[in-house]
Design a protein with these regions (language model features):
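Terminal accessory carbohydrate-recognition/targeting modules of carbohydrate-active enzymes
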Residues: 1-189, 222, 227-230, 241-242, ...
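Extended, well-ordered alpha-helical scaffold segments
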Residues: 164, 168-175, 189-196, 243-256, ...
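Extended glycan-interaction surfaces of carbohydrate-active proteins
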Residues: 187-226, 254-255, 260-296, 345-375, ...
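Aromatic-rich carbohydrate-recognition surfaces in CAZymes
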Residues: 225-352, 380, 496-512, 518, ...
Length: 573
């Protein structure tokens, strides 16, 4: 009853790709200290995984007491010989069936903290069947099978009913099969990676908890356990090819908690929302104060993400063949668009601005090194694009005055954006609190998304993309130009390639009619993910390797790989 047929062998390697299942917060990986041992961890918002180990030093021993090697891992379980190690959506760990005389040894972290796990009084963490405690010292437990088909269950969070291992494996196999059957069709050379990416989107699906009962596809169970607004847009764009309902749900959830002024929160999580500096834990507040502008000292700083909302909604509606989602969400999106112009406007930059690096999605970018308040060409391009989509929706809905408002505002914003164009450098400059920002980053290329810019500007941006001293890296497109003094190959947003910025540039090239160039960048982006070994958070622009601090199984990288691979297949057929 294994899941070997659902995913190509070797993809769940238990190192970069841990074993987990849909709706569970539990992950199982090899112990960093000893590869023959396993660890069970629980993903929680704003808590490092290394601080979330619930079961450590887990191993299966045969009747001689020798360790049974950890074998294959698939979407259903990890296999140690005939013994399965599986987790469930109820955050339980199941191990079995064990032959007579075999045993399981492990260390329960926080063994006296049942109350912290939400267990009712008297409900123990361990449930066993045909097993006897052989040894228990310093938290290490060894359970021996008295007869054939022995098994055990470990509760890791809250109450959970006793379930036999065969029932768990059967249910997990059925759910994994249903999910993988939805994996979109792609070209044969992309299929192996597409299946991994689709599996990642499935297992990253969680019920957030707290006041949020909806299913969210989190960016990663390894460090990003919540619904990030920006991530939700990109994830929905990929999900639309196989699960329209889940795609819609991501956008509806992301837009479900606007402020009274229309601002959309940065993050939704089990403990609440992150919408301003007031919502941050003290450690993050210290970082925020260090990064923020003196202009906003001692103020409540709003935190959000770039306005790509209408684009994501429009693409999901196109996949559905209707306009239902746009009609449902038009007013919320229009209010958030107005918030940028009315509440996130800065006279220092004469336009809407990121009032803090966190709101850009690119908080480590060098454009914020000397200015926290930035009127950025990417933000202005997104606002222009969003107003144009809102104009189209308003005309379709018979809202003529609103359509004209969106049209007029987009034209005014385009005029302001064009003032920052520097033809000799082939890019748009960001504007900070002290004037033009000179750092040469991918943000200066995002106005490719604006239909109607002069052909000379389009060609200037393309020349920058194809300049080997700037953005034509071995693996394109670096987030900072190669010749820029602030370029760093492996540091987040200061050089590495991100799938989402490449995806945006591909859309921009298509908008400008540069179809062959868009296809070439699409192909190289897909090749990068395959060469890099999976949908990582970001990639080296030198060799596509995963930088040391980049997380794995990253949601938008997986989703946008799917989107690009589906488009590639459609072009081929």
């Amino acid at each position: 009853m294994n899941g070997a047929s659902l995913l190509p062998a070797g993809l769940i390697d238990l190192d970069e790709v841990p074993y987990t299942v849909r709706r569970s917060r539990l992950l199982v990986r090899r112990s960093p200290q000893e590869s023959g041992l396993l660890q069970v961890l629980r993903a929680t918002y704003e808590r490092d995984l290394d601080e979330s180990i619930l079961v450590d030093q887990l191993e299966v021993l045969d009747e001689r007491g020798d360790r049974v090697q950890v074998g294959s891992a698939d979407p259903v379980a990890i296999w140690c010989g005939p013994v399965a190690v599986a987790v469930t959506a109820q955050d339980t760990v199941h191990i079995g069936p064990l032959p007579a005389g075999w045993s399981v040894r492990f260390l329960l972290q926080e063994p006296d903290a049942e109350h912290e796990l939400g267990l009712p009084t008297g409900q123990r963490r361990l449930w066993t069947h045909k097993m006897t405690v052989s040894d228990e010292a310093q938290g290490v437990i060894r359970l021996v099978a008295r007869s054939e088909a022995a098994e055990l269950m470990i509760r890791c969070a809250g109450p959970a009913p006793h379930r036999r291992i065969d029932e768990v494996l059967s249910a997990t196999s059925a759910e994994a099969s249903r999910w993988m059957a939805r994996c979109p069709a792609v070209l044969p050379q992309r299929e192996r990676m597409a299946r991994l990416c689709w599996w990642v989107l499935g297992v990253n699906t969680l019920a957030l908890g707290g006041a949020l009962d909806d299913l969210a596809v989190v960016p990663s169970k390894r460090g990003y356990v919540g619904l990030w607004q920006w991530d939700a847009y990109f994830i929905a764009i990929g999900l639309r090819h196989g699960d329209l309902d889940l795609a819609r749900g991501q956008l509806q959830l992301a837009l479900s908690r606007p402020s009274e002024y229309g601002q959309l929160p940065d993050v939704l999580h089990e403990q609440g929302i992150l919408a301003s500096s007031d919502d941050l834990p003290e450690t993050d507040l210290e970082n925020l104060r260090a990064m923020s502008s003196p202009t906003l000292a001692h103020q409540r700083i709003p935190l959000t993400k770039p306005p790509l909302t209408a684009l994501a909604v429009d693409l999901v509606d196109r996949a559905a063949g209707n306009t239902a989602l746009a009609e449902e969400l038009t007013d919320v999106i229009a209010a958030s668009q107005s918030w940028w112009f009315e509440r996130s406007w800065s006279d220092l930059v004469d336009g809407p601005a990121y009032l803090h690096p966190y709101s850009s999605g690119l908080d480590d970018s060098p454009v914020f090194d000397r200015s926290a308040i930035v009127g950025s060409p990417d933000l202005w391009a997104y606002l222009i694009l969003q107003d144009r989509i809102l104009e189209t929706w308003a005309r379709r809905q018979g809202r003529r005055d609103e359509a004209e408002h969106h049209r007029s505002r987009s034209q005014q914003m385009l005029g302001r954006l064009l003032e920052t164009w520097h033809a000799q450098e082939g890019r748009f400059h960001a504007v900070g609190e002290h004037g033009l920002i000179r750092e040469d980053t991918v943000l200066g290329l995002m106005p490719l998304l604006c239909d109607g810019v002069d052909p000379e500007i389009t060609q200037g941006l393309i020349a920058s993309l194809e300049d080997p001293d700037r953005f034509a890296a071995a693996v394109p497109v670096p987030t900072v130009a190669l010749a820029d003094p602030d370029f760093e190959e492996l540091r987040m947003w200061r050089g590495p390639v991100w799938v989402n910025t490449n995806w945006l540039l591909i859309q921009g090239l298509l908008i400008q009619g540069e179809v062959s160039r868009a296809k070439a960048l699409r192909r190289r982006t897909l090749d990068m993910v395959i060469s890099g070994g999976g949908p990582h958070e970001y990639f080296s622009c030198v060799d596509a390797a995963r930088p040391p601090r980049a997380t794995t199984c990253f949601g938008w990288s997986a989703a946008l790989f799917i989107d690009l691979a589906v488009a590639e297949a459609a072009d081929e057929t």
